[in-house]
């Protein structure tokens, strides 16, 4: 069996809407095997055991690109630690996992760049799939039907705290509340802060993240779909967070804190309990590897 491990991702980082994303050390593992015929699923709810399965669709996309007719396919979800519809890239783990698994079956026919192009074609934007495939913090754009990206050498000194609500928020639902157009003022607001944010991660001047992480494109609109958002967001800053932003389409709030801060998570847990919010807190770090093969036998 071919086993692929894919990291969670936090996209739409601050002002970097559809552009900035980071891979984190929380993983989904998928197993793949070519079989004599048919389509077999293991470890998944019955509703996903069909040809509409996003993992299968990504694999078929890759096989079709190669002109390969697969006899049969067995797909297993071995481990699912990335929560679904929480803004941590669960769908991207499926897309990237399927593409990487298919490429292994094909004998690594496609390059990493070609797999990224396929992932963006499927997903529609690069900010989740790029770090899921490549690891690290990635700045990516889509221009004239091609993806261009670069990885940021993130300086040490920080850790990421995922503050995960106990309810789902679909990307489709979160997209509906966004405005069709933005003002020049908001455009300048985000562009300037996105530039500063990249500089902060590159230089390690994390004291500036608080100002760089602000957004005018999506957070104000989507936060209204998340009961308790404002309270938790403001409390995170009060407790010493260097930066806070809505992860992906939400509902997870991502706090960036000093790596030496030992009190933030416990203090925030106390606050959530007082407020009656049954949210989960996960301390995470940067994953630089991206999607990896942890077992490679067909």
From Swiss-Prot:
* Gene Ontology cellular component terms for the protein in this record: cytoplasm
What Pfam families does this protein's entry cite? GHMP_kinases_C (PF08544), GHMP_kinases_N (PF00288)
Would I find Nucleotide-binding among this entry's keywords?
yes
Recorded GO terms, molecular function? ATP binding; homoserine kinase activity
Provide this UniProt record's keywords sorted from A to Z.
Answer: Amino-acid biosynthesis, ATP-binding, Cytoplasm, Kinase, Nucleotide-binding, Threonine biosynthesis, Transferase
> What Enzyme Commission number does this protein have?
2.7.1.39
Gene3D superfamilies in the record: 3.30.230.10, GHMP kinase, C-terminal domain
Detail which positions bind ATP. Answer: 83-93
Location of the protein in the cell = Cytoplasm
InterPro entries from the UniProt entry: GHMP_kinase_C_dom, GHMP_kinase_C_sf, GHMP_kinase_N_dom, GHMP_knse_ATP-bd_CS, Homoserine_kinase, Ribosomal_Su5_D2-typ_SF, Ribsml_uS5_D2-typ_fold_subgr
Q: Which GO terms describe its biological process?
A: threonine biosynthetic process
Query: What reaction does this catalyse?
Result: L-homoserine + ATP = O-phospho-L-homoserine + ADP + H(+)
Q: Which pathway does it serve?
A: Amino-acid biosynthesis; L-threonine biosynthesis; L-threonine from L-aspartate: step 4/5
Question: Highest taxon of the source?
Answer: Bacteria
Q: Which residues form the signal peptide?
A: none
Q: Decide whether keyword ATP-binding is in the record.
A: yes
The entry sums up its family as follows: Belongs to the GHMP kinase family. Homoserine kinase subfamily.
| NCBIfam families (alphabetical) | thrB
Free-text function comment from the UniProt entry: Catalyzes the ATP-dependent phosphorylation of L-homoserine to L-homoserine phosphate.
**Protein name, entry field:** Homoserine kinase
From which source organism is this entry?
A: Clostridium beijerinckii (strain ATCC 51743 / NCIMB 8052)
| Lineage of origin | Bacteria, Bacillati, Bacillota, Clostridia, Eubacteriales
